[in-house]
Amino acid sequence: MNATEKKRLDKLVRTYRNDLYVKTYKDMAIQSQLDSVVDQVEIQDYFEQNKANFRTNKDLLRGRYVRVSNENNNLRTIRRSLRRFNNTDKVFLDSIALQFTTYSMNDSIWVQSYQFFNRLPLISEKRYKNFLKNNTFFELQDSLEVYLVVIEEVVLRNELAPMEYVKPTLKQILINKRKLELMRQFDREIIEEGFRQKSYELY
């Protein structure tokens, strides 16, 4: 390596090192200033203004189910409680949950339909779309067990996604927007400081 090449390589190394220092400092400075708390109002506003961008590419639903022995002495009460599902019913179902083979009572959470029906082996992937209806109760039975299922609400593919379902995405978008604005602000301050010190180099 001749002297010219060595000089050029040294300059590249210095530039790379300086860029790395600047990037590390920049990342640390931005992270220290970044507010990652996003309130519900901000999420709601962004969602309302950008609804067209949040259409689901999967069928979604909110629902609950119980899988229980068809010889269970409480079967009639379980059926009634699962359908009605008031506070008393919830307490009752929770108190006998050990009698269930499997169950899910968290019907406030939106899930992809195929994930929900995968827990119900009596319903094939081809058949489950027949059950995608709002406020639906149905019952399936094999030789040993009964499947009691309530579908509260359905959102079909290409329809507007529920805000709660896309809430984590909305929150991350808003945090990224804040981060981008901090990066732009940081770059502006670096440029202004460079001009003030007459040490800014244009490439």
Annotate the PLM regions.
Residues M1-Y203:
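Peptidyl-prolyl cis-trans isomerase
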